[in-house]
């Protein structure tokens, strides 16, 4: 059944429909699209129409005039705005194929392991309405583990921690199945929110998402630097007291303080998962360690922070941002894998 569903060489694609970014893997070609999951809408006669999607739309975040808005249709790894998400998926699928009259693709989509039946159905229906012929769903930690090269088909335990924009997925896998999974709604977005809140509280400075993301990427760290303040960057925003633009300097230590809460939640999720892991699989994980994937895995010092709190070796995947999409793509390329990883989630 599964080989007949995705086995033919065609336009078949795998989609990592992330809160922050959407990646598309096309069968036989690899990753062909990586764009922000952002849509800009324009008000025309009381009706909202799509103005821009992806990279162009993200550049408009926080900068739109009154008759326009830039929004993220995905929140916490699931669809928050059904109609807008559908338009976004449709746009990306058409951009990938870039020609008229193509055969509608069969699609594999990643979903958070903690997604409800209603949330899974929303993703399934959005893809169908966007032009997919049939849709298969795969849990994100399974896709991340495959993309990171973990031996998920073997009778041995593997642990993956996938830190995305909206959620962190912690899972223990063995024999093509998920033995334990925990999905916590903390990820890159919560880190950005924590930085925005810190700047407001400690500097009376209002900054936007784009500036917060820049702070996270340039000096963000899971632990304060040993030599004091560490690197510093200048940040511009609006003074909350005077209402005028102002510039302040923020250090690595301050960034670590700002990120302490979301980092702590990720570490706690890992510890809870380890406590719930069966003894034999826990022994395997003690030998092989924990694999970090997702954009959040790039936060400096996060691997060391998890290692210090668990006593286990922690490895960041070679290409953490692409692991989920690559894992989906591997399933797409090798139909014999499908029964093991899609059977429980096929919609």
UniProtKB/Swiss-Prot annotation:
GO cellular component, as recorded: cytoplasm
Binding residues for ATP: 19-21, 165-167, 213-216, 295-298
Organism, as annotated: Caulobacter vibrioides (strain NA1000 / CB15N) (Caulobacter crescentus)
Cell compartments where the protein resides: Cytoplasm
InterPro entries the UniProt entry points to: ATPase_NBD, MreB, MreB_MamK-like
Gene3D superfamilies the record matches: 3.30.420.40
Record's protein name: Cell shape-determining protein MreB
Gene expressing this chain: mreB
UniProt-listed GO biological process terms: cell morphogenesis; regulation of cell shape
Assembly mode: Forms polymers in the presence of ATP. Forms pairs of protofilaments that adopt an antiparallel arrangement and bind to lipids.
Knockout mutant characteristics: Depletion results in lemon-shaped cells that possess defects in the integrity of the cell wall.
Keyword terms of this UniProt record: ATP-binding, Cell shape, Cytoplasm, Nucleotide-binding
UniProt key word RNA-binding: no
Its biological purpose: Forms membrane-associated dynamic filaments that are essential for cell shape determination. Acts by regulating cell wall synthesis and cell elongation, and thus cell shape. A feedback loop between cell geometry and MreB localization may maintain elongated cell shape by targeting cell wall growth to regions of negative cell wall curvature. Required for mid-cell peptidoglycan synthesis and cell division. Directs the localization of the cytosolic peptidoglycan precursor-synthesizing enzyme MurG. Also required for proper chromosome segregation.
Molecular function terms from GO: ATP binding
Protein family membership: Belongs to the FtsA/MreB family.
């Amino acid at each position: 059944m599964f080989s007949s569903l995705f086995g033919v060489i065609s336009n078949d694609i795998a989609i990592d429909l992330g809160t922050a970014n959407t990646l598309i893997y096309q069968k036989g070609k690899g990753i062909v699209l990586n764009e922000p999951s952002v849509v800009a809408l324009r008000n025309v006669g009381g009706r909202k129409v799509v103005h821009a999607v992806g990279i162009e739309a993200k550049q408009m975040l926080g900068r739109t005039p009154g008759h326009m808005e830039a929004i993220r249709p995905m929140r916490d790894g699931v669809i928050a705005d059904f109609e807008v998400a559908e338009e976004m998926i449709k746009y990306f699928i058409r951009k990938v194929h870039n020609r008229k009259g193509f055969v509608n693709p069969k699609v594999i989509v990643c979903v958070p392991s903690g997604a409800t039946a209603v949330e899974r159905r929303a993703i399934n229906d959005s893809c169908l309405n966007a032009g997919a012929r049939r849709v298969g769903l795969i849990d994100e930690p399974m896709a991340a583990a495959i993309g990171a090269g973990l031996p998920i088909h073997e009778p041995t335990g593997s642990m993956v921690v996938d830190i995305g924009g909206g959620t962190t997925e912690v899972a223990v896998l063995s024999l093509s199945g998920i033995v334990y999974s925990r999905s916590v709604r903390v990820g890159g977005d919560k880190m950005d929110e924590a930085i925005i809140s810190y700047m407001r509280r400690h500097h009376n400075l209002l900054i936007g998402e784009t500036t917060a993301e820049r702070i996270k990427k340039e000096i963000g760290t899971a632990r304060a630097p040993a030599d004091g303040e560490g690197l510093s960057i200048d940040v511009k925003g609006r003074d909350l007291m005077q209402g005028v633009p102002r510039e302040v300097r923020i250090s690595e230590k301050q960034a670590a303080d700002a990120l302490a809460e979301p980092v702590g939640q990720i570490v706690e999720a890992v510890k809870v998962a380890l406590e719930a892991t069966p003894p034999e699989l826990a022994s395997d994980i003690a030998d092989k360690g924990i694999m970090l994937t997702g954009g959040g895995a790039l936060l400096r010092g996060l691997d060391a922070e998890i290692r210090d709190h668990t006593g286990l070796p922690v490895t960041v995947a070679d290409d953490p941002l692409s692991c989920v999409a690559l894992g989906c793509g591997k399933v797409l390329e090798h139909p014999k894998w499908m029964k093991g990883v899609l059977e429980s989630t096929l919609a």
